[in-house]
Amino acid sequence: MSTTPPNPYSFNTRNPNRANPFPQIQTAPPVSENKNITTFPFKTPLPKHYNPALNTPYFTDITKRILTDFYPKKCPTPECNSRILDKEISTRPDLIRCPQCRYLTSRLSYTPLHHFKLPIWMFGFVLYESIIQYPKVVTATELSKKLRIGYNAASLLKRRFQLFASDQLPKYKTLTFNALEDKFRDFLLPPNENKDITSKMRNKPYVCVDTAVLYSAGERASQGRKRYSHRGQTSSIYLSEKLGGKQIGTLVQTIAVKHGPVFFTSVPNQKAETLEPLIKEHLPTSTPLFTDQGYPWLWGVYRNHRSVNHSARSKDNRFRFARNRWSKNGVHNQVAEGNHRVLKTAFASYGYIRPEYSQLYLNEFSFIKNANVFGLDILVGEGGGSCLSRDAFSSNARATARGAVRIGGKGSLFEKYPHLLAENIML
């Protein structure tokens, strides 16, 4: 009786991300067919999601550190007096208990990792990769290939990281507001708007506000129909009224500080009643604010508001636009424009984002940018409040060794594990 030889190649055609990295050639009968074999080859039992190319203990410690610092668990027993749970279980990294009364609970419950089914080291991997790859974004497709998981699992993993970023981003907003309030407490620009303010703003951070459109809807998306009820940038994010007028694009409001943090907000329009509360929530009224001429109503709110005319005409008939239409008398909004270029280049990797999920992606990008500026230790009170100093947003903050705003802040979390950092083969 002839038997069909086993397939020499084992491929998973339904999900290539779960397949082996190289074709596995069958050179010997399987163990199930030869019970007496005691030498090689034999099947080695490997844990699920095993990946020898990644230093999983390193990323596990990062996840534990994040959960301990940002979501500490306290013992509910009255005798323990709300003691923080810090006793780990070697075989259960998702559990933690009290060293005194042995109270046991999950360290993932009521956190962004609530009911997390994947290994917890994957969350630390997403945080690590997002910080070191900035301004490039980490997509779900990239995670599915590197972690060898399905695309849906990678999408949910990225969504959990976006929830964590959205939860911690208000802390950066408070730090920025307090630093700007302390920096420009009694600051006043000259009342004459035509006077050059370059010397007045020297060694001071420029705060710029602007809007941009992501994934705009052209006439092809509207099946060749024009849009009569919308004008300006708003017209490029809505479909034609005959097609229902649904929003398919994203309008982003940007608040950026030079050499400092940036905050992106998804807005439906550019009306004053929509943008004014957002700006007042992020910036104190004494801040020198620089925009284009799309914000004429800001002069009644911010006394140090200045605008530049991007459509200024040239006095020379040989040219259409003036040379100073981008920067005039020290007034410009290039800080916001530069962040728009970084944002558009990064979000091109996603292809398209639905408007209802746009704020999560913007919060993630803002959090990674601000983590590169402030660091992560400042969020848990280990920075000593140095970000509130008057040099927090200085123009030479990157050059200072101990400045509160510094790119070097992104390494503060990983410096807690120098022994693991030396062993990480991915570096």
Named regions from a protein language model:
Residues 2-427:
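Residue-level recognition of single "structural anchor" positions
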